Amino acid sequence: VLSPGSAAHAGDRARARAVLERGGGGALSFMTTWTGNAYWFAPGVDAAIAYRVRGRIAVTLGGAFGRDRTDPGVARAFVDFCGERGWTPVFYSVDDVESATLDELGWSRTQVAEEARLDPATWTPAGKKRQDERTATHRAAREGVRAEWTTWSELSFRDRAQIREISEAWVADKTIPEMEFTLGGVEQMTDPAVRLMIARDGQH
């Protein structure tokens, strides 16, 4: 038995992905395409919000996405949508624009992380603070480890089996479940739109 909002209705996931692909989103927006999310579509504008309901709490996965995601009315309308169903909305990992809208509604906020964006054209490993990164890079080079961009469909059967084995071993060694809600798992790697970077040693 599924609780309200615990899973998307047929077609909602495809519709949400189309909204996302038309443009407009944050660092977590692609995660909204994963299974297990429900979707709310803003009336009259091109925006949507992915969420999951636990008890009477509706937790969003990031903020709104879509071309009209920055419209202040989107967050307000989602709050009203939740209120009509007796849910308390919680906006998880939203940007400053969306936070400002919620501030106007008298909401409080708690910082859970910081987002770092690196420009590959200007980033450098130079400097004392990045000594550990240089050490790891040099060691990998000595041991013949190289990085390779690929997709799940391009991997060989052997590579796929090894990745599954690594994933299962990681889960078996932990006392907590795989954190699919924010980090994803093997299932999410199989999406054709997802690029993978794998590290190969000198023997492969």
Walk through the language-model features, giving the residues of each:
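A conserved beta-strand-loop-helix scaffold within acyl/acetyltransferase catalytic domains
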Residues: 5-56, 63, 87, 91-109, ...
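Acidic/polar active-site rim loop that often engages polyanionic ligands
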Residues: 114-121, 138-145
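"Short basic amphipathic alpha-helical interaction patches in structured regions
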Residues: 73-75, 130-132, 136
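Glycine-rich phosphate-binding "P-loop"
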Residues: 60-69
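Conserved acetyl-CoA-binding loop-helix of GNAT-fold acetyltransferases
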Residues: 69-80
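Short glycine-/small-residue-rich flexible loop motifs, especially phosphate/cofactor-binding loops
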Residues: 79, 99, 137
